[in-house]
Structures are given as structure tokens and as C-alpha cells.
Amino acid sequence: AASDVYKRQGVEMLEERSHIPVVGVAPYLDIQVEDEDSLTERFDRKQEVDLIDIAVIRVPRISNFTDFNPLESIPGVSLRYVQHVSELKNPDMIILPGTKNTMEDLLWMRANGLEATVLKEAAKGKIIFGICGGYQMLGETLSDPHHVEAGGTIKGMGLLPMDTVFAEKKTRTRVSGRFLELEGELQALSGAELEGYEIHMGETVLKGEAGHSVSIEDQVSGECKEDGAYCKNVCGTYVHGVFDREDVAEAVVRVLGEKKGIDVSQMTGIDFAAFKETQYDILAAELRKHLDMKKIYEILEQGI
């Protein structure tokens, strides 16, 4: 076919100009390996409130916003991104997301009044959940002796009795595990299995009455450890993708529904962990079909 001729000519031209082997041409694939919405579309959605209302604090350096896809997928759940105190309204749960600069974003929250408002909501018994940088913010102090971020030490929000020190070495790994036996407001999460990944610079040490929130196994090193923290209505973890498993997302909705006295038994989403795995399998099969896998493995083993 003419298209194959043009493709072959294009590959030859690229190899001639770059002096690098071209191992194939992958076609457009309609595969949902991550969220298709742009950040602008996601953040500019109407701030409508549904049966269960979850507010994510939209810090300036927000990262890993795909953490919230599983919650957004559940009918009857509204997930709103909030930048100002006036936008917060009266959510059932507040999430502090991951951030590229924990200390700067906490200072931003402090300056615009969102920190004080979140503290008031926590005092009323509202569920507060932090992921990675958002989890670090919940503690008592954040110290940066190596100038990984801004340097120095600042006061945290004080919702969890723990301290974080930023390290020079970055943690990057995949994990799986489960929620530990939680007491109080978040008891429904106890035992729920989770999987996700960690990517952070900090080490957090618990103290006082806080307990770890999850038990995880590093899928790379095999190391097992307890991670995160919880105390009463406040919970956090370093694990991104913590809501991907259907059991976790539905347990969160169940907790919030029970607090409001509404029936959420029909409010179910999809298992994002299983869905993503299926999509990755399709992607892998298609790439194998269109790429010179023998050449790729040869490069992996011997170099170019």
C-alpha cells in the first residue's frame, strides 16, 4: 500500500537525519491511560453541589490531580476545586492534594485564609484528607534543612501530631497495601485494599496519639512499612492513587453519606485500578504489534 511506502520512507529519512534507529510508527490509539480533560477544563467546571460534596483545595502548584478521578466518577458526588474561602461553602470532605512545593503552597493557604477555614471545618468534625504534600501540610512542622524547597522551618496546620523533614533523596516507587484498623469517623476504610505510587522528598515522623493510616509494600524493593497518619476525622498518606480501588472510593462515600444520614448504597463508580490495568494491556498489545520489539530489547540489553 502507498501508506506503507510513505511510512517506510519517513522512517528511513528520520534514521538518516538523526543517526538513531527508528523502531516503529505507533498509530493513534483511543486508550484512556489517564484523564483526557485539560487542567483548564477540569478547574473551570461549574461548581455545582451534589448529594455528596467534596472540595479539593486548588493550591497554585497542584500535582497528580488524577488522584480524584475515581471520586468524580461516582454518580451523586460533586468534586469541586476551590481557590478562595468564598468558594468552599459547606463540603462534606476537604482534600489537600499533592503539590510541587508543599511549603510555598501552605504559606499561600495561610495568606488567603483557606488554612484558617479548613481548621475551623476540621474542628466541626469535617473529614479532612491529605495526599503527599497535602498530607505533609497537616502536621505540626515542615523542615527543609537541605533547601529542597524554600529552606528553613515553618509551622504546619497542626491537625496531625507529626513532623516532616525534606530529604535530598527523592522517593519514587509503586506500592500496594491496605488501610489499617482506623477508629472513629473513618472506620469504614479499615481493611480496604489500595494500590498506587509514592513520589516525594520528605520523611514524616508521627508522635502522640496519631496512628498510621495504611500498611504498604514497596513493589520495587519488597519493603513493607506503615505509612500515613490519622487522628479522629483527619487522615493522610503519601500514596497517590489511594482512591483508585473501588473499595476505597466507595468506603469514603459511605462515610460521608452516613454522616449526612443519606443512603449511598446505589452510588457506585468503577474500579479505576482495574480499568487502568486493562487500558495498559491494550496499549502494550498495540505497541507490540507496531514496534520492532526485538530491536527494543536489543537496545535495552546492549545499548544503541
Feature names for model-found ranges:
Residues 182-232:
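Catalytic beta-strand/loop cores that center a nucleophilic Ser/Cys/Thr
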Residues 8-13, 32-45, 96-97, 172-176:
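Short, surface-exposed amphipathic charged segments that create phosphate/polyanion-binding patches used
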